[in-house]
């Protein structure tokens, strides 16, 4: 997934939006390019688009270290008319699974390896060139290679440090097996 939402002036958030704000319901029915494919029951061009309520979960409020003077809060997505959770929203799907585990006497603990590629050109350059002829930042396998991955530290060190400062339990990062591939590990929590 990706973070979607709005940027509020702090005072407006405190005065008017700390309990709810709104978004178009197409946000849960778009592809990565923000196109709205047909076939979704909850929203479509044929039936029109409505609103969802975004209800801030203030327990998730945290400073965003990489943007000065910025905080972030995650929201639950509610139906505009019933004020009930939208069942296909990512947080609602996750909460149902956590509730199922709890009912079975199990406490969920997760960790993840976030694997991705770094390229020589910027995303904007790559997009303009049609995502063709991508050149990885490294020309070979850098799996566990401390010396060679030093050249990626201008990206990886701030990533580790900013996420950790935002409360994400970062464990480590390392090179991976494919050219230009990186791995960021998040500790069990």
Region spans (language model):
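Active-site neighborhood of thiol-dependent amide/isopeptide-bond enzymes
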Residues: 188-189
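Active-site-proximal, well-structured secondary-structure segments within enzyme catalytic domains
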Residues: 172-185
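ATP/Mg2+-dependent ligation/transfer catalytic cores
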Residues: 2-175
């Amino acid at each position: 997934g990706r973070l979607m939402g709005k940027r509020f002036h702090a005072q407006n958030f405190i005065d008017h939006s700390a309990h709810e704000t709104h978004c178009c319901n197409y946000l849960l029915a778009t592809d990565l390019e923000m196109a709205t494919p047909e076939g979704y029951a909850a929203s479509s061009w044929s039936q029109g688009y409505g609103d969802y309520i975004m209800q801030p979960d203030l327990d998730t409020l945290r400073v965003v270290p990489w943007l000065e003077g910025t905080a972030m809060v995650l929201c639950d997505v509610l139906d505009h008319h019933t004020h009930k959770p939208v069942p296909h929203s990512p947080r609602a799907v996750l909460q149902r699974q956590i509730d199922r585990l709890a009912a079975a006497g199990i406490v969920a603990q997760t960790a993840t390896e976030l694997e991705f590629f770094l390229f020589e050109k910027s995303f904007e350059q790559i997009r303009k060139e049609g995502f063709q002829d991508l050149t990885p930042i490294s020309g070979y396998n850098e799996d566990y290679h401390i010396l060679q991955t030093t050249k990626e530290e201008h990206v990886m060190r701030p990533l580790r440090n900013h996420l950790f400062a935002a409360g994400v339990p970062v464990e480590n990062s390392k090179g991976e097996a494919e050219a230009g591939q990186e791995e960021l590990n998040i500790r069990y929590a």
